[in-house]
């Protein structure tokens, strides 16, 4: 037997936590969440599902902050943090007072914006926010192309998330998504 000091146990614990975090995510992404009035498990589950699905090999850092946003009249925000060129660090702010369905859809909506930033379709050009090289400031909020895409995809992603988490088959998914091809008929 080899004697183990308290410092060895602490360092092993931190190392184990780090390794567990990396393998649990399946990707090299790092997600933190804070605030009040939300389900930590649901927040992690949806975020990890999205990042594993769309960015399994990217190193993305996401901080999800839950706070009261009613005064601002929004359910959520997604902002890049740090460098504008190839952003990989993001802050997502979510309202704390949402039911489960609205919470998941809002988080997915903001994660779609994260994807837009990562793939480069949403970026700053000459100090203006642009989507596919077109400034979005000339549109009202509801008609901005990046918001239209996020609203369309949040519904589809919500159903995909529920189907994958509930173990539905391809046939059951095809009932809701008729444009999906079935592998085996």
Predicted regions and their residues:
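Extreme N-terminal basic, low-complexity initiation segments
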Residues: 1-11
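Aromatic (phenylalanine/tyrosine) cluster motif
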Residues: 15-18, 23
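Zn2+-dependent metallopeptidase catalytic core
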Residues: 38-58
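Active-site scaffold of zinc-dependent metalloenzymes
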Residues: 72-101
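Post-HEXXH active-site segment of zinc metalloproteases
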Residues: 101, 117-148
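Active-site recognition of the HExxH zinc-binding catalytic motif
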Residues: 105-117
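Short alpha-helical functional segments enriched in proximate histidine and acidic residues
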Residues: 114, 118, 153, 157
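Long, well-structured alpha-helical subdomains associated
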Residues: 140-143, 154-185
């Amino acid at each position: 037997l080899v004697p183990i000091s308290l410092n060895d146990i602490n360092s092993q614990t931190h190392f184990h936590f780090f390794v567990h975090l990396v393998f649990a995510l399946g990707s090299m992404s790092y997600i933190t969440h804070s605030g009040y009035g939300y389900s930590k498990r649901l927040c992690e589950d949806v975020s990890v599902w999205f990042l594993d699905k769309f960015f399994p090999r990217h190193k993305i850092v996401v901080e999800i902050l839950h706070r009261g946003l009613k005064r601002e009249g929004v359910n959520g925000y997604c902002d890049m943090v740090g460098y504008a060129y190839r952003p990989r660090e993001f802050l997502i702010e979510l309202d704390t007072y949402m039911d489960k369905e609205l919470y998941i859809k809002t988080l997915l909506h903001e994660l779609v914006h994260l994807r837009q930033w990562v793939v480069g379709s949403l970026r700053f050009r000459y100090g203006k926010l642009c989507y596919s090289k077109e400034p979005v400031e000339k549109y009202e909020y509801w008609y901005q192309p990046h918001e239209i895409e996020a609203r369309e995809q949040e519904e589809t992603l919500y159903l995909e998330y529920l189907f994958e988490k509930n173990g539905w088959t391809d046939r059951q998914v095809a009932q809701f998504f008729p444009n999906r091809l079935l592998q085996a008929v």
